[in-house]
Amino acid sequence: MSQLRALIRGADAGVIEEVKWKKPSRPEGVPVWSHDGIVCIGEALKNAVRLTFPKGAQLKDPKGLFNTRLDSKMVRAIDFHEGDAIKETALRALIVEGVRLNRS
């Protein structure tokens, strides 16, 4: 998750990381990256780290990073499994496009 955090924060200087939605089942909360609205949400799952893009269906994904939540009308997500290579340039482009979408 730390590598993803650094990449997301580095994609746009205005992106802010916050921890939200603390509850008894998840006392550590959930990392959320915002810039004029939520860009993406991080989640540590049992076998993966998931980045969820609440407006993902509106984002262009020419490199095919989205691999889950593909049937949703709004949301798209990327599950990263241990050993997966992070396509940094493509992920950075999704973050930048997410910021642009929020600002439009």
Provide a role label for each language-model segment.
Residues M1-S104:
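Charge-dense, helix-prone N-terminal extensions
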